[in-house]
Amino acid sequence: PPLATRGIGGKPLDAFAIDTIRLPFDNPWDALLFTAGHDFLPDGSALVCTAHGDVWRLTGLDASLENVTWRRYATGLFQPLGLKVVDGRGYVIGRDQITRLHDLNADGEADFYENFNNDLLSAGGGHAYATSLETDSRGNFYFTKCAEGTAHGGSLIRVSGDGGKLGVFATGFRNPNGLGIGPGDVITVGDQQGGWVPETRVDVMRRGGFY
């Protein structure tokens, strides 16, 4: 059954109006709610993925935020840390693959988890995360992969819009966990401090670049 929480609207005069929505920590599955990615569906509801493998669908995201409902939409994913809605369907990036979620019987829960692309190489280390799923104006998908001993480690990865091809777009990162694509398909990536990276930074990407 859906779970209900409430939210608090942000101040509209601030540079960014940040709405705060309470998480349904008291839920039938005792599911942990380490939120990791979100995007909005055409009807104004939202999909939110959590690091422990769930995707939740939120409704009631109106101006009042008095009755925000949460329904677990998908579960069992491998540490999903990025989510993107394209043509009304949720795409989730996990350590293992991009998964496209389908609700075939329109009951509010995904019943088909499609392997959209699983060409990603992963050594399974403690920091072998894939994060931050976004798309460009041509429909290509992008995500970041933390450094490890594979050809895809420490890279910005691009996947074709049909899921048929995966390749490295840029490399040299440590543990990137932030990706944005702006006007003109300008791509920015945020790397994290540690090891050979003296401070957290944001870089503007160029194809084939080393950062």
Regions found by a protein language model. Give the residues of each.
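Beta-propeller domains with acidic blade repeats across secreted/periplasmic ectodomains
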Residues: 1-211
